[in-house]
């Protein structure tokens, strides 16, 4: 990453599930802490799959985090001595997080936001696309497709072992769903509207 010469900016870490987003966020948090910077870490209260008060990677690494229900709550915990604001699972917040993050960066804070850029349908997820557009730095990570081993940019939702339908809720709380990384060609979403362009190249994949 290039070196910032001024204080106050936004970094976004995005990708599919199992791509190492939380691991990368934790790495940046620990690096800042090693540099004696004050870091405040946040996560949405809805994200309690592994822990209610920690950011936990799939490798088992973790850092303590403050669970918040709304973006505006971040301001209650951030002070003039804070240097870095880290936010995990940012896709679960409302679009209000965009203004909050912009305000923090404009006030001189280094903001690091990590989250899914696509939902299980393979469509833009919540505020993440806007944050990517506004960020000074975007790191898009890829996992490994569980079907073919190719780079995976999408998240496959499975319900009882079968691909979830397009009409399923974007966010499921307390459901018995499972997820795995998939590439573009092995990502399955039954019921997803087809988009066919009237162009000869559109038929190439089926030839």
Swiss-Prot record:
Entry EC no(s): 2.7.1.21
Binding-site residues, Zn(2+): 145, 148, 183, 186
Domain of life of the native organism: Bacteria
Biased composition (Basic residues): 184-197
Biased composition regions of type Basic and acidic residues, renumbered to the chain: 198-207
Keyword Transmembrane tagged: no
UniProt keyword Metal-binding present: yes
One Pfam family hit: TK
Enzymatic class: transferase
Subunit organization: Homotetramer.
PANTHER family tied to this protein: THYMIDINE KINASE, THYMIDINE KINASE, CYTOSOLIC
Stated name of the protein: Thymidine kinase
Native source species: Geobacillus thermodenitrificans (strain NG80-2)
Recorded name of the encoding gene: tdk
């Amino acid at each position: 990453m290039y070196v910032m010469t001024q204080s106050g900016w936004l970094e976004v870490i995005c990708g599919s599930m199992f791509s190492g987003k939380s691991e990368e966020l934790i790495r940046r948090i620990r690096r800042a802490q090693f540099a004696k910077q004050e870091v405040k870490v946040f996560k949405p209260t809805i994200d309690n799959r592994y822990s209610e008060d920690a950011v936990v990677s799939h490798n088992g690494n973790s850092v303590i985090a403050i669970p918040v229900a709304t973006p505006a709550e971040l301001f209650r915990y951030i002070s003039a001595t804070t240097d870095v604001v880290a936010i995990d699972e940012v896709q679960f917040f409302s679009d209000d997080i965009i203004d909050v993050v912009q305000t923090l960066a404009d006030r001189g804070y280094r903001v690091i936001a990590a989250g899914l850029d696509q939902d299980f349908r393979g469509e833009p997820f919540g505020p993440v696309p806007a944050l990517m557009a506004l960020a000074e730095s975007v790191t898009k990570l890829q996992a490994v497709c569980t079907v073919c081993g190719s780079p995976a940019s999408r998240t496959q939702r499975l319900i009882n072992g079968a691909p979830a339908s397009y009409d399923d809720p974007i966010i499921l709380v307390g459901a018995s769903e499972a997820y795995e990384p998939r590439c573009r060609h092995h990502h399955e979403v039954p019921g997803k509207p087809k988009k066919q362009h009237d162009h000869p190249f559109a038929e190439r994949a089926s030839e």
